[in-house]
UniProtKB/Swiss-Prot annotation:
The keyword Metal-binding does not apply. NCBIfam families: PRK00939.1, SUI1_rel. Keywords: Protein biosynthesis, Translation regulation. It comes from Methanosphaera stadtmanae (strain ATCC 43021 / DSM 3091 / JCM 11832 / MCB-3). This is Protein translation factor SUI1 homolog. The keyword Cell inner membrane does not apply. InterPro entries: DENR/SUI1_TIF (IPR050318), SUI1 (IPR001950), SUI1_arc (IPR022851), SUI1_arc_bac (IPR005872), SUI1_dom_sf (IPR036877).
Length: 101
């Protein structure tokens, strides 16, 4: 049985990740990359509290696009701002703290 390093409870009973999701201020915006392609950037997620690789994998499958996680931010190919907000809100992030630019 794994023990949470933050609260000391077993991983099954740990609520640290849920609390971290509600508190974080997430920014979602698009930028133009090479050849005029759009990339959706998701930043402001603390890597220590939330598994950013697993979150990237979930967002890529829900948005049906390619992407990666680099330097503490998630990059998705295409314009997926609204879909990302819906998915993050469904995963427990507070929709008030998700800022779309």
């Amino acid at each position: 049985m794994k023990i949470c390093e933050i609260c000391g409870l077993p991983k099954d009973l740990c609520v640290c990740e849920e609390i971290a999701r509600e508190v974080q201020k997430v920014k979602v915006y698009t930028v133009r990359r090479r050849f005029g392609k759009l990339m959706t950037i998701v930043e402001g997620i603390d890597e220590h509290d939330i598994d950013i690789r697993e979150l990237t994998k979930t967002l890529k499958s829900k948005c049906a696009c390619g992407g990666t996680s680099k330097k503490g931010q998630i990059e998705l190919q295409g314009d997926h701002k609204r879909k990302v907000k819906e998915v993050l809100a469904g995963m427990g992030f507070s929709s008030d703290t998700i800022e779309i630019k």
